[in-house]
Amino acid sequence: MGVKTFTHSSSSHSQEMLGKLNMLRNDGHFCDITIRVQDRIFRAHKVVLAACSDFFRTKLVGQTEDENKNVLDLHHVTVTGFIPLLEYAYTATLSINTENIIDVLAAASYMQMFSVASTCSEFMKSSILWNTPNSQPEKGLDAGQENSSNCNFTSRDGSISPVSSECSAVERTIPVCRESRRKRKSYIVMSPESPVKCSTQTNSPQVLNSSASYAENRNQPVDSSLAFPWTFPFGIDRRIQPEKAKQAENTRTLELPGPSEAGRRMADYVTCESTKTTLPLGTEEDVRVKVERLSDEEVHEEVSQPVSASQSSLSDQQTVPGSEPVQEDLLISPQSSSIGSVDEGVTEGLPTLQSTSSTNAHADEDDRLENVQYPYQLYIAPSTSSTERPSPNGPDRPFQCPTCGVRFTRIQNLKQHMLIHSGIKPFQCDCCGKKFTRAYSLKMHRLKHEVIS
């Protein structure tokens, strides 16, 4: 006679275990590690932290008794971002709001809690509530959204993330496809293979049709190597063959091409990029160039491109001198909703490729405008020489964006970079309806209408 076997499976056992572990932590029982964040002390259990975070598992697993430290300092994490993650480790519930989501996202990325970081990123892109009285509701949006105090967000894989948010305004749905997100910019590359010429005309009527070339070439096949918007943070694109001698001899002036000509050049560039050979690292120029197909959802922070008067009129890349600086905690404020957007040419103090032709008269003005358009400069450790660059993946850049993988040296830079992925552009032009993420970018855009009129 066979032995009967009965298996009991309790769905509430894990929650009960976490609840009891949280009670032990709150009472201070069996806590074997102390976390210090911004001079605040948090008691916890090593086994819980190591099970939730790859960062803590790397720190704690494999240590000998002599090397075992009971106090662990987290220098790159804020208290506002750490407390929700600690509560999540013991309760499996993440409580975020519009004031702490950036801190939580930065802390989760640093602590390598990528599932939490992905949830925060998706929530910020799809469920953040913005209270912008000056912005007009877009056409095609559902006006019958209901107010909710607890928002359950469904991720891409179909799982429901228990994300609670205190909602004080009507939820605003971000459309999946908008005209502004379909626009791609064809960056002008000054290479020997494509000697592009551009004039400094800023009031040309062709500026208004600068994006028409994308509609003509959007259905053309693209090489697989160019299908994803990869950036090359240090050094130029490996697929570009620069020649310093030819660039020094041939002083080029930038000339604004028409819509059809710009589309043809972009198509020719895309088709011939795959045939170019790869250069060794030693022969690269000390410039940073990024040529790719971009949208508002596929934006990276570290973008370098040629800066000239004509291009500033094409994509409104300049900023207004003397404008008020953007504060770090302005997640609710629209002025910081998308810092680093390529549409507005924000860079992180990186070197740019300056033209050596008749636009030299505008070089000083471009440099002056470029220096004021980003409130946070690239931080270099005091031990690093001013002429050296920190490693793109080294300890100088400990903060990584979970959405696009860009790394940063300061937590403030990552916090502001994450605002890009929200896709919110609250400032709209009254003349043409184009939207911007910053007020001063809208001011510069209005100057173009004044010049044309």
UniProtKB/Swiss-Prot annotation:
One of its GO terms (cellular component) is nucleus. One of its GO terms (molecular function) is DNA binding. It holds the Pfam family zf-C2H2. A zinc finger (C2H2-type) spans 399-421, 427-449. The keyword Aminoacyl-tRNA synthetase does not apply. Residues 241-265, 295-324, 336-368 are annotated as: Disordered. There is a cross-link at K4, K290 (Glycyl lysine isopeptide (Lys-Gly) (interchain with G-Cter in SUMO2)). The modification Phosphoserine is found at S135, S159, S161, S165, S191, S194, S199. Residues 352-361 have a biased composition (Polar residues). CDD domains: BTB_POZ_ZBTB44. Residues 31-98 form the BTB domain. It is found in: Nucleus. Residues 304-318 have a biased composition (Low complexity). The modification Phosphothreonine is found at T200. Gene3D superfamilies: Classic Zinc Finger, Potassium Channel Kv1.1, Chain A. Keywords: DNA-binding, Isopeptide bond, Metal-binding, Nucleus, Phosphoprotein, Repeat, Transcription, Transcription regulation, Ubl conjugation, Zinc, Zinc-finger. InterPro entries: BTB/POZ_dom (IPR000210), SKP1/BTB/POZ_sf (IPR011333), Znf_C2H2_sf (IPR036236), Znf_C2H2_type (IPR013087), ZnFinger_BTB_dom_contain (IPR050457). This is Zinc finger and BTB domain-containing protein 44. It comes from Rattus norvegicus (Rat). The gene is Zbtb44.
